[in-house]
Amino acid sequence: MEREKKHFKLTDETINFNGKTLHRIEALVDIPCFAVSVGDLGGFLESYNNLCDNAWVGNEAKVYGNAVVTGNARIFGSAVVCDNAQVYGDACVYDSAIVSGYASISNNYRQGLLLFSRAALALIKRKRKR
């Protein structure tokens, strides 16, 4: 079976995050739908298995563990996808969102989690104190 040709490579730039060594990615092809060009740096992955198809991880976003981002999904900002989570289709996970456990996100479909921005969490906490 032929190995899937990847659209990115893991660079030598690494960070330690939650006890895992994550590598910054670099684009090997243009991905026009995300305004990514050959040579652009993206976010961080633990392994090649974390990212497939045309999906992209940008900025300081992190994907690790058995988590998989596929299809045309995009993870960016400071978002984290980990454990056994799956993000696929045309889904977008961004800002400080965390997708973990066995959560699954596809397009606008969410299963197994709620996503809140930090601003939304702060608002909820303020309302609870009243």
Task: Please give the residue ranges for each predicted region.
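Terminal amphipathic alpha-helical/low-complexity segments used for targeting or macromolecular assembly
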Residues: M1-D53, Y102, N107-R130
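A detector of tandem-repeat and repeat-rich interaction/domain scaffolds
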Residues: D53-N108
